[in-house]
């Protein structure tokens, strides 16, 4: 099962839609900001399974602040991250929440910075921002799950090409708070 993970699209959906069209994922996860963009995916691709949570800019959204889903036998904790205290240099208490629900993978956004850490045997990924990156490269995350295991995790640019987190530099002239 291939899963595309997006966060922080902020209404700029063209790259997100192009990636879905070109990569044909089995499911999409949107981690907030803007939840309406996930709704647009659902309307445009009615046969595509789309999971979403709300972010700090999703005023009036009915989506949950977090969600726990099981895909191909792997349990995921989904959140935007703002309520778990994430910052550029820390995943906050996401590992604690994921562990409480028995999840082996936690996904979050909010910082606009792609990241992967392992904390207490839990893989914690931030897909970065598909539209307003703080690291200079807009990104999403592609996960491959088979037989109850994470087989592959690759950060992709807006063309669907793999990117290395170590090669990204903060080229933005903006400071995001």
Annotated model-derived regions:
Residues 5-7, 27-33, 51-56, 78-80, ...:
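Active-site neighborhood of phospho(di)ester-bond hydrolases with catalytic His/Asp-centered motifs
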Residues 1-48, 58-60, 64-65, 137-139, ...:
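N-terminal active-site segment of His-dependent metallophosphoesterases
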């Amino acid at each position: 099962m291939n899963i595309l993970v997006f966060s922080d699209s902020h209404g700029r959906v063209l790259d997100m839609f192009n990636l879905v069209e070109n990569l044909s994922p089995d499911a999409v996860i949107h981690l907030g900001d803007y939840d309406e963009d996930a709704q647009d995916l659902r309307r445009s691709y009615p046969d595509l399974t789309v999971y979403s949570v709300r972010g700090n800019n999703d005023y009036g959204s009915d989506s949950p602040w977090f969600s726990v889903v099981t895909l191909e036998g792997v349990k995921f904790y989904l959140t935007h991250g703002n309520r778990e205290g994430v910052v550029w240099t820390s995943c906050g208490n996401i590992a604690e929440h994921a562990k409480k629900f028995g999840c082996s993978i936690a996904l979050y956004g909010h910082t606009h910075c792609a990241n992967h850490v392992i904390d207490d045997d839990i893989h914690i990924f931030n897909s970065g921002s598909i539209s307003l990156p703080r690291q200079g490269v807009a990104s999403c995350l592609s996960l491959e799950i088979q037989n109850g295991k994470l087989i592959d995790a690759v950060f992709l640019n807006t063309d669907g090409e793999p990117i290395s987190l170590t090669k990204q530099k903060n080229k933005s002239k903006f400071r995001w708070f």
